[in-house]
Amino acid sequence: MIKFIEETVDYLKGKGFESPEIGIILGTGLGQLVNEITIIKEVSYNHIPNFPTATVEFHKGKLIYGELEGKKVIIMQGRFHIYEGYSLQDVTYPVRIMEKLGIKTLLVSNASGAINLDYKKGELMLIDDHLNLQGSSPLAFKGVELLGERFADMSLPYDVAINNKFKAIAKANNIKLHEGVYASVVGPQLETRAEYRMLKILGADAVGMSTVPEIIVANHLGLKAAAISVLTDECDPNNLQPVDISEIIAMAAKAEPEMITLFKKLIKTL
């Protein structure tokens, strides 16, 4: 993996991706933050050596380098998932690349279903902790100790100082921002009523199919990490309604302006 990482980093440096401070992963229906940045360079994932290729049709599949609120940022416009047939090492490969390029902070967004019935669709949830239900770990491979501590500490996977800033920004801008536990499952099928009941018993407030692998690797690399979910549907097992993926995307897009406000104002403080 080290050789692949070096090849990818050399390619991106040659394209002008120089010393980004912050990495941002944009999830389902949340790609419009790129309209807020001054783009310096952008490259399709298809053209980046050793990079996975986005197969989800509503993910743009671009790596973008630019300036936002006075900071150099690198943005993944679309991410990878284990349900696309990728390994967890593939899914998290871009995080390792962004770290080698220079980022110190990783910000992540996603669309998720609300298990906590006090949370409503269209609202946002700051992730305070998570449940890794992906069936494995992105650190479970030979040679991982060459890239960082094998037994990565996960006592505080989400940076407390950044989360406190997010909460203060939300309050100042009258944005409802819940805080809770995110469960990451494989997908791509949505959950059954029994699975939602199980997740609630386990302590999950929301469920999705991403984010946790990237956060694990961010911690492995010593990055500060934070993540926010857009709650796109309500997962009440006693009144479960069929959900269409187009509805999820539409709800994420509706909540996107508040997400953009939070990210922009946070980045200004970093």
Residues of each region from the PLM?
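Generic hydrophobic/aromatic pocket-lining and core-packing "Φ" positions
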Residues: 95, 196, 212-215
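His/Asp/Glu-rich mid-to-C-terminal helical/loop segments that flank catalytic regions of hydrolases
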Residues: 235-270
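Zn-dependent metallopeptidase/amidohydrolase metal-coordination segment
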Residues: 209-247
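Metabolite-binding pocket within alpha/beta catalytic cores that recognizes anionic/polar moieties
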Residues: 1-154
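Non-catalytic positions within long, well-ordered alpha-helices that form the structural scaffold/packing
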Residues: 99-100, 200, 219
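Short acidic/polar active-site loop segments enriched in Thr and Asp
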Residues: 104-105, 205, 224
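Polyanion-binding loop/helix "lid" in catalytic or ligand-binding cores
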Residues: 147-158, 186, 196, 252-264
